[in-house]
Curated annotation (Swiss-Prot):
Is a potent and selective inhibitor of alpha-1/beta-1 (ITGA1/ITGB1) integrin. It blocks the adhesion of alpha-1/beta-1-expressing K562 cells to immobilized collagens IV and I with IC(50) of 2 and 0.5 nM, respectively. Potently inhibits angiogenesis in chicken and in mouse model and reduces tumor development by half. Is 25-fold less potent than viperistatin. It is found in: Secreted. GO terms for biological process: angiogenesis; cell differentiation. This is Disintegrin obtustatin. Keywords: Angiogenesis, Cell adhesion impairing toxin, Developmental protein, Differentiation, Disulfide bond, Secreted, Toxin. The record marks 22 as: Indirectly maintains the active conformation of the loop. Disulfide bonds join 1-10, 6-29, 7-34, 19-36. Negative results: does not show inhibitory activity toward alpha-2/beta-1 (ITGA2/ITGB1), alpha-IIb/beta-3 (ITGA2B/ITGB3), alpha-V/beta-3 (ITGAV/ITGB3), alpha-4/beta-1 (ITGA4/ITGB1), alpha-5/beta-1 (ITGA5/ITGB1), alpha-6/beta-1 (ITGA6/ITGB1), and alpha-9/beta-1 (ITGA9/ITGB1), alpha-4/beta-7 (ITGA4/ITGB7) integrins. The keyword S-adenosyl-L-methionine does not apply. Signal peptide: none annotated. GO terms for cellular component: extracellular region. Residues 1-41 form the Disintegrin domain.
Amino acid sequence: CTTGPCCRQCKLKPAGTTCWKTSLTSHYCTGKSCDCPLYPG
């Protein structure tokens, strides 16, 4: 992976890493994709 909220320095962030957070909920990286599940961007 090269870009995305779940990518850092061309590597996937670990599963469970917060990729998007609001005052009501958080979404987490899966460790298998550079995209954030349900990320609104």
